[in-house]
Amino acid sequence: MGKYFGTSGIRGRVGEFLTPELALRAGRALGEYLGGGTVAVGRDTRVHCDALRAAVISGLTAQGCDVVDIGVVCTPTLGCYVATEGLDAGVMITASHNPPEYNGIKFWDSDGMAFSPEQEREIEQIMDGDLEYPNWDEYGEVVDDETALNVHVERILDEVSVDGDGLRIVVDCANGPSAFVTPVVLREMGCEVISLNAHPDGHFPGREPEPKPENLKDLMRTVRATDADLGIAHDGDADRVVFVTEEGKFAGYDEVLALVCRRILEEKGPGKVAVNVDASMVIDEVVREMGGEVVRTKVGDVHVAAAIREEGCVFGGEPNGTWIHPDVHMCPDGPLSAAWMVSLLIEEGRPLSELLAEIPSYPVVRETVECPDELKPEVMRLVETRLREAYDDIDTVDGVRVELDDGWVLVRPSGTEPLIRITVEAESEERARELRDEFVDIVRRCVEEVRE
């Protein structure tokens, strides 16, 4: 966590932390970092996107960058456009799944991959420095390009089966820009599409933009009422996708990710798959069965993308529906992932519930322990020491993860709240609760010891 950048770019409440002035400084800093070039700027449907977009564009052009304004688009549309058109960088104005009073600014490199924490730290240093303006004839220019959505749609259709065989699909677009991509792609694939919340509206009147089960009741009911074959839901900027089975039931995050990993390794052969430290052990089981290898990363799509690039992974994803298909581009792509899942159902000729029934499911329990932010580093150092004294298989890529014969435990400080989170997965509910109680006690003792 930096001064301005969090786990997913610059993000916060508009008018409090995130202001047009800050957006201007961020735009100028990116322009200085790039030293010129051409940058695409996109935005989601939030009501304050226009003000922030104008400020970012002003900052970029004031540092000599040319700007292509691609309008209201999905985050993966921006990533795909930057990579396909050979631009130098991209800027997306979005707060993804956060409520409507939030917004954010996220930078993307020429491959459509999110800026790394190291790059973001450089941007922060530039933001806090004194920048000189260029000569009057060295300012950048702005052009509009409305073709970015078409570029994205066509790129997706190049990757999937286009014989939808009349499948009936319900798509919940969350009043976001996915309405311009996912329904279009699925209809081109030959599917019958029923759209929910498909009118762009930055107030998100249809539902909260985070696609979690409690926000998807309408989607589940509609799937059942229309006898649909699948339900699909995106977040506010469509870098994520989740699914509802033909039975109208929410498809488990980890089980879906495991299913996707298995299919990709079937198609591509044994290879590496990148997932974060919070992903289920069922993914390890499935990947091992296919002769592959799991690479664990910190939580966050930028870390998954970095592992894909560094380790040569054939796929990467997080259980929340953030999936990266490196053969296409390095940005998490909800519409592409949705089309990919529909293509899988077409090829298998079986419903999603039947495919998921083949994937084991293990109980997961979560707990939190209060811990002031200023104590977190020392508490986590002490937690690691205590756990190394008691356990052999320890991973510290993000927090402390303990691997056990019948499960795992992750102790990780929250990036947004004064809490330390404990996540436990085990082969039985009883064992999961037993491990939860044990590790909660360890963490509480460490907090108390540091406070003394």
UniProtKB/Swiss-Prot annotation:
Modification comment: Activated by phosphorylation.
Chain positions found as Phosphoserine: S96
Key word Lipoprotein present: no
EC number: 5.4.2.10
Catalyses which reaction(s): alpha-D-glucosamine 1-phosphate = D-glucosamine 6-phosphate
Residues noted as binding Mg(2+) in the record, renumbered to the chain: S96, D235, D237, D239
Biological processes per GO annotation: carbohydrate metabolic process
SUPFAM superfamilies: Phosphoglucomutase, C-terminal domain, Phosphoglucomutase, first 3 domains
GO molecular function, one term: magnesium ion binding
Xref: Pfam families: PGM_PMM_I, PGM_PMM_II, PGM_PMM_III, PGM_PMM_IV
Cofactor(s) demanded: Mg(2+)
Active site residues according to the UniProt entry: S96
Domain of life according to the entry: Archaea
Keyword Repeat: no
Cofactor note: Binds 1 Mg(2+) ion per subunit.
UniProt keyword annotations, A-Z: Isomerase, Magnesium, Metal-binding, Phosphoprotein
Function of the protein: Catalyzes the conversion of glucosamine-6-phosphate to glucosamine-1-phosphate.
Family in the record: Belongs to the phosphohexose mutase family.
NCBIfam families per the UniProt record, alphabetical: Arch_GlmM
Name listed for the protein in its UniProt record: Probable phosphoglucosamine mutase
Organism of this sequence: Methanopyrus kandleri (strain AV19 / DSM 6324 / JCM 9639 / NBRC 100938)
Gene symbol of the encoding locus: glmM
